[in-house]
């Protein structure tokens, strides 16, 4: 697949971007290089390669998802600057 200057200018027009001819030619050349690299990668035989979720062999150790109703609310409210009826009060910042 080849990206032409016309393709770039059409996309720029649809996107309401102002591009001159020289910039469009530069973009088309760069995109052609990128697509050429993708063609090279597409030709690599990956039949015996397992898909990876992570490039590192590390595994995340996750804790059990167990509901815990004790969040220590009384302890938090004891050190909060302002509390009223179990709610945290904060100063008004927008008038």
From Swiss-Prot:
GO molecular function: asparaginyl-tRNA synthase (glutamine-hydrolyzing) activity; ATP binding; glutaminyl-tRNA synthase (glutamine-hydrolyzing) activity
The EC number(s) this enzyme carries: 6.3.5.-
Domain of life, per lineage: Bacteria
Catalytic class of the enzyme: ligase
Keyword field: ATP-binding, Ligase, Nucleotide-binding, Protein biosynthesis
SUPFAM superfamilies reported for this sequence: Glu-tRNAGln amidotransferase C subunit
Coiled-coil residue spans: none
Any one biological process term the GO annotation gives: translation
Catalytic activity: L-glutamyl-tRNA(Gln) + L-glutamine + ATP + H2O = L-glutaminyl-tRNA(Gln) + L-glutamate + ADP + phosphate + H(+); L-aspartyl-tRNA(Asn) + L-glutamine + ATP + H2O = L-asparaginyl-tRNA(Asn) + L-glutamate + ADP + phosphate + 2 H(+)
Listed Pfam families: GatC (PF02686)
Assembly and interaction partners: Heterotrimer of A, B and C subunits.
Family label: Belongs to the GatC family.
HAMAP family, sorted: GatC
Function as written in the Swiss-Prot or TrEMBL entry: Allows the formation of correctly charged Asn-tRNA(Asn) or Gln-tRNA(Gln) through the transamidation of misacylated Asp-tRNA(Asn) or Glu-tRNA(Gln) in organisms which lack either or both of asparaginyl-tRNA or glutaminyl-tRNA synthetases. The reaction takes place in the presence of glutamine and ATP through an activated phospho-Asp-tRNA(Asn) or phospho-Glu-tRNA(Gln).
Official protein name in the record: Glutamyl-tRNA(Gln) amidotransferase subunit C
Organism for this UniProt entry: Moraxella catarrhalis
Taxonomic lineage of the native organism: Bacteria, Pseudomonadati, Pseudomonadota, Gammaproteobacteria, Moraxellales
